[in-house]
UniProtKB/Swiss-Prot annotation:
Its main location: cytoplasm. One of its GO terms (cellular component) is cytoplasm. Substrate binds at residues 133, 269, 278, 287. The gene is pdxA. One of its GO terms (biological process) is pyridoxal phosphate biosynthetic process. It is found in: Cytoplasm. This is 4-hydroxythreonine-4-phosphate dehydrogenase. It comes from Xylella fastidiosa (strain 9a5c).
Length: 330
């Protein structure tokens, strides 16, 4: 399979997702076939705002010219007003994600590319929602890891959206081991690295300084690393986060595992925010998302940067091909 079929889910309809999707399909793709799971009227309105062509096709059709986009319609209750989210449309946003995921699980599609979703708006609708990563993991009934990547760096997270005061209690040996196994498997299978070198950051300053600045490294991190190294995994650390991202050290890693959100992601975003993407490791299909928010203040103005969506789509296509080739070999 060298031309995978990918679901394209714009996310929050009042944000920049729809117009970024319109920009994405202005050039026919050679690496994948895209099927949008979205509200047709919203996409048409985005195309009109950008003064770009858009021809919506049946979901099984092939895109043949600029602006062609097969679509599995997810109609909204109320018309979209760019910049003004409507909680009444939140069920359609969730339905688009769930239907796309179901099609991937059943083999009709080979991966999902997602735009930014507005968590607060979905929760205001009465739907409990913590994030797309968690939603897809629950639907697939599997453990997942969030990884953000750009052309220079890959950073996976042991914990994601938690208050900082809660992080030490959440990081258990079982959680850390599960995270490292998922990252190692993904680096081997999805990214084709036979023996990935994974840098693991410590939780505390200076990785605990031998216990003087916290015992989590001694009590949790080091025993897990020793156990997994005995199985053959190449794990570096625990490393002090303040020097782990020096360029001379990064050349020795294939991925970095950070203990919490703001330990690793500021460095990644500083090194290449426009090309950064969010990858969900551990799902039975590739899912790659943009690494930015809904940008309600930019929606409908035609000024939003599509670079992250372009990068997410290209990477998702490559990962889908890697999975197919791995399946053939096994």
């Amino acid at each position: 399979m060298l031309h995978p079929a990918l679901a394209l889910v714009p996310g929050e309809p009042a944000g920049v997702g729809p117009e970024l999707c319109v920009r994405l399909v202005q050039q026919p793709r050679q690496d994948c076939r895209l099927v949008a799971f979205a509200d047709p009227a919203t996409l048409q309105a985005a195309a009109a705002a950008l003064d770009l062509p858009l021809r919506l096709l049946p979901p099984e059709a092939l895109a043949e010219r600029p602006g062609d986009l097969p679509i599995q319609a997810q109609c909204h209750v109320h018309p979209t007003r760019f910049g003004h989210p409507d909680p009444a449309n939140a069920p359609a946003v969730i339905a688009a994600l769930c239907e796309a995921a179901s099609d991937c699980v059943h083999g009709a599609l080979h991966g999902i590319v997602t735009g930014p979703v507005h968590k607060a708006v979905i929760n205001q609708s009465g739907i409990h929602y913590t994030g797309t990563t968690e939603l897809l993991a629950a639907q697939a009934e599997c453990d997942v890891v969030m990884m953000l990547a750009n052309p220079h760096l890959r950073v996976a997270l042991v914990t994601t959206h938690l208050p900082l005061r809660d992080v030490p209690d959440v990081i258990t040996a079982a959680l850390l081991e599960r995270c490292l196994r998922i990252v190692n498997t993904a680096m081997c299978g999805d990214f084709g690295i036979a023996t990935p070198r994974i840098a693991v950051l410590g939780l505390n300053p200076h990785a605990g300084e031998g216990g003087y600045l916290g015992r989590e490294e001694l009590d949790v991190v080091i025993p897990v690393l020793q156990r997994l190294r005995a199985e053959g995994m190449v794990l570096l650390g625990p490393l002090s986060a303040d020097t782990a991202f020096l360029p001379t050290k990064l050349i020795g890693y294939d991925a970095v595992v950070a203990m919490y959100h703001d330990q690793g992601l500021p460095v990644l975003k500083h090194s290449g925010f426009e090309q950064a993407v969010n990858i969900t490791l551990g799902l039975p299909y590739p899912r790659v998302a943009v690494d930015h928010g809904t940008a309600l203040d930019l929606a409908g103005r035609g000024v939003a940067d599509p670079s992250s969506l372009f990068a997410a789509t290209a990477l998702c296509a490559r990962l889908a091909v890697s999975r197919a080739l791995l399946s053939v070999r096994s």
